[in-house]
């Protein structure tokens, strides 16, 4: 994640899953399956570069509901490591975001960290108007959906309010 500047809003969640980091990374790395477990995600597809390589790009369309609406952005992979850890950034409508996921081995499975940093005036407004709480619920639902997808093969597509 970014250490040079301070984000105006941060949303961070963790969840433990009963699978190895390698199994989770294999499931997570299939970008075409993201809409199956991430309720706010409409579409995600690679647009350039080798998947999961620095500089590779993918387009994602998210629906956040009122007042955030629908957002389409091109994400660029900015960091990846074998732990596994991956981070990407996107810029749209005056806001920049850096999203990262880390998969750490734990007793009985893996601890998954989801961290989202937001920069720019829209991020400030989101914090002022308590929209980060809504974003927290959205990303928490994504982790719960990922857990259900990995552990039981079921899909949870309920958008949190």
Language model segments and positions:
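Short coil-to-beta transition motif at edge beta-strands of beta-rich domains
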Residues: 52-60
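Hydrophobic ligand-binding cavity/cleft-lining segments
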Residues: 1-49, 53, 161
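A conserved amphipathic terminal alpha-helix motif
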Residues: 118-161
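Hydrophobic-ligand binding "helix-grip"
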Residues: 5, 35, 61-113, 117-122, ...
